[in-house]
Amino acid sequence: MPTEISVFLLSLQAMPLKLTTYYRGSKVPDLPGTNTFHSTELFRIYEETPGYTPILIVASEDDKPVAKLLAAIRKSVRMFPPGIIKRCEVYGTGEYFNNEADKEIIFSDMLQRLTNEALRDSFLIEFRNLENAMFGYKSFRDNQYIAINWLRVRNSLHSVEKVEERFSPSRIRQIKKGLKNGAQVREARTKEEILCFAQMLRHVYSSKIRRHFPSIKFFQHLENQLT
């Protein structure tokens, strides 16, 4: 993988589309956008967190950014073979700044570029949190991606009144079983408690193939970016 920047020129209708791939946060210029999952700030957090290698693809027309796509190659070490696993994770399908441009075409070019780059070091690429399941469908298929059904469970805690009514019977049984076995729920207030909580979650998620809990350093860098 290149160490800093790579640039490709593609044809987007009558206007050439330039794809620039960034591998170092120090080389990323000021970019527009408000999507946290494709931001320069998250790129730098990935860069500073052990086990993460960020890749940022910026699409430009006439030297003006029209879209960007942030991905991260994550390395995990497991007790069972293969001991070291690298996978690329992307949240969403990027952020776009030109409402008149064809987002599907731009995404197709960025996706192909990302696929070629990421598969050099990772064994799979996973896109999560897709807002529109049909957006980019043809591009995903053309690049050999497959759809995976995934169950999402969301329990709103904005109102604590009658919160049990929003839980499923199986979830309530799990909670009661945990309380019966001595589980406690309380806020972590000190750095030591937060560290212990993070270590516990990493231990729980370490045996799960599709789930991951980042290093505590990820959240420390996130806090530094927000304060």
Q: Residue spans of the language-model regions?
A:
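Acidic, Ala/Val/Gly-enriched low-complexity intrinsically disordered segments
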Residues: 4-7, 14
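Compositionally biased, intrinsically disordered low-complexity segments
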Residues: 8-11, 88
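A conserved beta-strand-loop-helix scaffold within acyl/acetyltransferase catalytic domains
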Residues: 11-62, 66-78, 130-154, 158, ...
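Acyl-donor binding region in acyl/amide transferases
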Residues: 76-147
